[in-house]
């Protein structure tokens, strides 16, 4: 049976994530129905809008539920920021930052499992005006 990954989001917004997970052999559950998350082996928190203040209860519930049961969580862009805020970290807004037309592509350095999956210098896209300021203790 394929591993199930719960992709927290609205259908129609995350086709790239969906396609990548399915091509890697995962069965993806894309919805906001918390009960569907109970049978999933992993959680993907994708990118999205800004985080202003505490996280919505749904995201906090999902993070707590997956962390308590030691199921893997992957936060991408806003998703990583959500994990940081949830566990006590802070974000920094970059006032006046102008978002470019299109995504910026730049190389990164991967280690461990990510390097085995993606190579040592995968290119990533980014378009942010918020960033992690103080890293939450569980993420250090």
Question: Which residues does each PLM region occupy?
Answer:
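N-terminal beta1-alpha1 cap of cysteine-dependent amidohydrolase-like domains
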Residues: 1-74, 78, 85-92, 96-123, ...
């Amino acid at each position: 049976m394929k591993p199930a990954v719960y992709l927290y989001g609205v259908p129609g917004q995350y086709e790239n994530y969906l396609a990548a997970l399915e091509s890697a052999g995962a069965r993806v559950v894309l919805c906001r129905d918390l009960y569907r998350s109970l049978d999933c082996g992993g959680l993907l928190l994708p990118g999205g809008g800004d985080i202003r203040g505490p996280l919505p209860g749904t995201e906090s519930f999902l993070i707590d539920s997956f962390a308590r049961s030691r199921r893997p969580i992957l936060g991408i862009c806003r998703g990583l920021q959500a994990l940081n805020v949830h566990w006590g970290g802070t974000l920094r807004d970059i006032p006046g930052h102008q978002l470019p037309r299109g995504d910026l592509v730049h190389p990164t350095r991967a280690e461990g499992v990510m390097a085995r999956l993606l190579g040592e210098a995968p290119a990533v896209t980014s378009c942010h005006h918020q960033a992690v300021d103080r890293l939450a203790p569980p993420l250090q």
